[in-house]
C-alpha cells in the first residue's frame, strides 16, 4: 500500500501541478472532485465518472450517516465497494450540511445536535463521531469537523467560530485512526479577515494534518472578496501539502484559485447544471432547453469525446431534456463532468509548460 504523499512536479508562479499518492491510487493536481452526496454521482454510473477523467470524488458524511448509515456501509465492505468506485474518496465532515439543512440545530462545545431533515429523528454530531463515521465509510481523505462561518459575520463572530473550529480540529485529529495511504485535512476558517485566517492556519498547522482546506468561501462574499482571501491564505500553509478550496466550482473561480496556489476543488455545479439542461463548453454555457436548439443537428462541442458529443445532436439533447427523459440528465451530466476534467487537464498542461492560463474557460 502506498503512503500518502504530495509531490509538486511543476510550478508556474503560485500555480502547482503535481500528484497526490493515496491508498486508493493517484490524484493528478489541480484536481476537480465530482460530488457524490449520497454515495452516487446523480444520473451517472461510477465507471462512467471514471471515464470522464476524474481521479477522486466526494461523499457526504451527513447524508450517509442518515441513510443507509455508516455502520451498514461498513458491514457491506465500505463506501468504495458499496458504490463500485475504486479510486480515492474524500468525505466532508457533515457540519456544513447539518447547519444548513437542519431547521433546528444547536451548536455547543460538544458538537452539533440536530433533527434529521428526513424523519425528524434526533442526532448529535461531534468531532469524534464525524471522524468515526468517515472511518467506517473507508474514506481515503477525511475532513476535520468544523463550523462553517456564516457570511456576513463580524470580526468577533468570526473569531469565536475560528476558536471553536480549532478546538474541534484538535479533537478530530486525536480521533483520526492513522493508516498508510489515508489522510485527514484540517479546515481553515476566518471569514474575510486576514488576521483570523492567519491565526486559524497557524493553529491547524500545529496539528500536522496531511493536507489543509480553505472553508467558509463561496457563501455569498463574491468573487472579488474570495480572491482577496486566496491571495494570502495559502501563504500561511505548508507548501508541501495539498490545499483544497471547498465548494468552489465555477470555471473562472477555479482558474483564479489555481493561480493562487489551490490544488483541489469540489462543487455540484457540473452535475446540477447538467440535470437542469445547462452545458458547459469552451465557447460558453448552453441552455439546451432553449427553442433555438430544437433543429440544431450539431454536437455540443465537436472536439469533446463524451458520449453526448460523439453520438448525439443538440436537437436530441433538447428533446430529451424538454420531455424530462432520464437519458437527457445522464448525457448532459456526462458532458459537464468531461468538460470540467478537460479543464483541469488543460490547466495542468499550461502549468507544466510554464504558461499563463487565465484565458482558459
From Swiss-Prot:
Domain of life: Bacteria
Annotated residues for binding of substrate: 92-96, 146, 189, 216
Keywords linked to the UniProt accession: Glycosyltransferase, Metal-binding, Queuosine biosynthesis, Transferase, tRNA processing, Zinc
Xref: Gene3D superfamilies: Queuine tRNA-ribosyltransferase-like
Keyword Metal-binding: yes
Class of this enzyme: transferase
Name this polypeptide is given: Queuine tRNA-ribosyltransferase
Amino acid at each position: 500500500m502506498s503512503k500518502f504523499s504530495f509531490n509538486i512536479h511543476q510550478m508556474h508562479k503560485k500555480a502547482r501541478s503535481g500528484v497526490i499518492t493515496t491508498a486508493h491510487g493517484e490524484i493528478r493536481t489541480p484536481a476537480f472532485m465530482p460530488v457524490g452526496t449520497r454515495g452516487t454521482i446523480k444520473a451517472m454510473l461510477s465507471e462512467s465518472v471514471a471515464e470522464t477523467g476524474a481521479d477522486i470524488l466526494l461523499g457526504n458524511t451527513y447524508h450517509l450517516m442518515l441513510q443507509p448509515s455508516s455502520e451498514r456501509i461498513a458491514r457491506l465492505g465500505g463506501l468504495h465497494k458499496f458504490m463500485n468506485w475504486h479510486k480515492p474518496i474524500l468525505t466532508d465532515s457533515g457540519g456544513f450540511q447539518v447547519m444548513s439543512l437542519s431547521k433546528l440545530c444547536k451548536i455547543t462545545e460538544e458538537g452539533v445536535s440536530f433533527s434529521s431533515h428526513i424523519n425528524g429523528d434526533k442526532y448529535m454530531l461531534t468531532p469524534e463521531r464525524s471522524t468515526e463515521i468517515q472511518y467506517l465509510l473507508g474514506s481515503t481523505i477525511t475532513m476535520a469537523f468544523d463550523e462553517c462561518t456564516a457570511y456576513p459575520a463580524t470580526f468577533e463572530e468570526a473569531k469565536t467560530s475560528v476558536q471553536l473550529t480549532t478546538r474541534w480540529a484538535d479533537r478530530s485529529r486525536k480521533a483520526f485512526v492513522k493508516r498508510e495511504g489515508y489522510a485527514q485535512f484540517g479546515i481553515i476558517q476566518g471569514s474575510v479577515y486576514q488576521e483570523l485566517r492567519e491565526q486559524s492556519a497557524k493553529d491547524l498547522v500545529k496539528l500536522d494534518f496531511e493536507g489543509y482546506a480553505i472553508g467558509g468561501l463561496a457563501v455569498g462574499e463574491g468573487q472579488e472578496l474570495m480572491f482577496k482571501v486566496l491571495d494570502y491564505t495559502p501563504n500561511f500553509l505548508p507548501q508541501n501539502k495539498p490545499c483544497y478550496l471547498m465548494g468552489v466550482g465555477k470555471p473562472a473561480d477555479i482558474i483564479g484559485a489555481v493561480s493562487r496556489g489551490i490544488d483541489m476543488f469540489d462543487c455540484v455545479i457540473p452535475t446540477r447544471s447538467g440535470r437542469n439542461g445547462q452545458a458547459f463548453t469552451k465557447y460558453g454555457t448552453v441552455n439546451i432547453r432553449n427553442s433555438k436548439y430544437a433543429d440544431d443537428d450539431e454536437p455540443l462541442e465537436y472536439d469533446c469525446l463524451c458520449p453526448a458529443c460523439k453520438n448525439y445532436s443538440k436537437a436530441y439533447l433538447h428533446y430529451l431534456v424538454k420531455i424530462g427523459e432520464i437519458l437527457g440528465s445522464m448525457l448532459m451530466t456526462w458532458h459537464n463532468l468531461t468538460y470540467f476534467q478537460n479543464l483541469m487537464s488543460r490547466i495542468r498542461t499550461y502549468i507544466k509548460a510554464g504558461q499563463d492560463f487565465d484565458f482558459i474557460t
